[in-house]
Amino acid sequence: MVVSKFVQIRRDLHKIPEIGFKEWKTQQYILDYIGTLSNEHVEVKVWRTGVIVKVKGRNPEKVIGYRADIDGLPITEETGYEFASVHEGMMHACGHDLHTTIGLGLLTAAVTERIDDDLVFLFQPAEEGPGGALPMLESEELKEWKPNIILGLHIAPEYPVGTIATKEGLLFANTSELYVDLKGKGGHAAYPHTANDMIVAASHLVTQLQSVISRNVNPLDSAVITIGKITGGTVQNIIAEKSRLEGTIRTLSVESMSRVKSRIEAIVAGIEASFQCEAVIDYGAMYHQVYNHEALTREFMQFVSEQTDMKVITCTEAMTGEDFGYMLQEIPGFMFWLGVNSEYGLHHAKLKPDEEAIEKAIVFLDQYVKWKGTRK
């Protein structure tokens, strides 16, 4: 079977997933590819492990931006691909290999046939954590090339190839990591009265957290707290001195995020008093909601529906987290789901996006950018 140029690029990238801010091989791959395109109209900047590329327009009045996240996840791959990850314990399980490939395809088209406006491509590291969008947005490297309009996409396993889905306004939730470390006094299992058990304390905390959403968030709003990991103790006959909870908070409104965190802090303070222990809360990476610019999104959906071969679906908002939300706080723009028809979902070890979606995305995005690049 003959593999197209951009499918091969995706497969090359799929082999080398890297954790946030350590995407050195990915960065070099992107730079090497751009080097094959370079001409007098292309400028390149390196920012940490990311890459920023500008294609000068013929008669620029604005700057259109495309953002692609480039990092992988600490997941052991189970796809059975011949081109599976060569980095043990790492996988492109969220489609960032496709996001990057589509960006390189769109860049190739932009160099081949320049539009009136300038185009800026942001190959952004660390979306999965600790978050690269905000520091890239604030960087000196981007300051003089800051887009006036920006767009981004995310693969959607549940939608068929040839489909995009988006909506005006709120698309993705506010998200925050949650880490709670408890420290008390350990001891022998035969003498529980001389210790204060941090496994019991952690268990009480998990149980109490379940009421935060149901009794503090408007039922017409949406929020969720998930505790995904608990660690504590050493062996079966020693009362644990320490325990740790790890989870996430997701809310559709900024106000709910603030309220939920306030209640978590009050409950943790109660655990400290009840179990005579010390507690430390760390919110880790926090991502602002993805809020699509209404007029630009409406215009994009209409264009794609009427002037391309893609099908457009108006979706509902999702509890997904995306640091692209920080860029949309500063720059008008939008994000959309790209259908890739995979049996397994995002962050799954068996995620297998349909590669046909790659060239379909490049083609219709090139159509959109050329159209948008000739409009005021």
UniProtKB/Swiss-Prot annotation:
Record Gene3D superfamilies: 3.30.70.360, Zn peptidases (3.40.630.10)
Gene Ontology MF term list: N-acetyldiaminopimelate deacetylase activity
Enzyme Commission designation: 3.5.1.47
Pathway given in the UniProt record: Amino-acid biosynthesis; L-lysine biosynthesis via DAP pathway; LL-2,6-diaminopimelate from (S)-tetrahydrodipicolinate (acetylase route): step 3/3
Pfam families in alphabetical order: M20_dimer, Peptidase_M20
Keywords (A to Z) from UniProt: Amino-acid biosynthesis, Diaminopimelate biosynthesis, Hydrolase, Lysine biosynthesis
Source superkingdom: Bacteria
Keyword Hydrolase: yes
InterPro entries, alphabetized: AcetylDAP_deacetylase (IPR023905), Amidohydrolase (IPR017439), Bact_exopeptidase_dim_dom (IPR036264), Peptidase_M20 (IPR002933), Peptidase_M20_dimer (IPR011650)
Active site residues per record: D69, E128 (proton acceptor)
Enzyme class: hydrolase
Catalytic activity field: N-acetyl-(2S,6S)-2,6-diaminopimelate + H2O = (2S,6S)-2,6-diaminopimelate + acetate
GO biological process: diaminopimelate biosynthetic process; lysine biosynthetic process via diaminopimelate
Residues making up the signal peptide according to the UniProt record: none
UniProt xrefs under NCBIfam families: amidohydrolases (TIGR01891)
HAMAP family hit by this protein: DapEL
Family: Belongs to the peptidase M20A family. N-acetyldiaminopimelate deacetylase subfamily.
Known role: Catalyzes the conversion of N-acetyl-diaminopimelate to diaminopimelate and acetate.
Name recorded for this polypeptide: N-acetyldiaminopimelate deacetylase
